[in-house]
C-alpha cells in the first residue's frame, strides 16, 4: 500500500499520525483539497479506496460513527459539507486496534438525474473530510484515515498450512 501525505485525513505529510475523537462531533485533522471539484469515486481498475484504521483501542465511551463528507468550492474555502458515506454507529467493544472502520471504494458523488426520484444533487466536492460522532466520553482511542490506491489486507495463514487448488 502506498500512502500519499496529500491524501491523509489524519496527521501530517511524511508521518502516520492519528485523530483521537473523545466526545461529541469532531472533524478530521486534515481537509483534503482536490484543487478542482471532481468525482473521485468514478472509474475503476483500480478505484481509489477510503481506508480508516483503528491504531489504539477505544475505551470508556459507548460508540463511534464515521462519516466521509464533501464540500464544494466557496471562493477557495469549503462550502457546506454533505455526507457521502456513513458507517452507522459502531459499538465500543468493536473499536479495537488493528480493525478497519472503512475499507471501501471511494463513494461516487450523488447526482440528481431525471426520473430517479433524487430530490437534489450533491455538488461536486473540492474538499473532503472525515467526521466522527461519538457517544460517551472516550478515554483512549486513535484513528488513521487516508485515501489510498490499494489496500494491504491480505489473508495471513499460519505457517505450514496447505491450500488445495
What does each model-found stretch correspond to?
Residues 1-165:
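Surface-exposed, low-hydrophobicity beta-strand/loop segments enriched in small/polar/acidic residues
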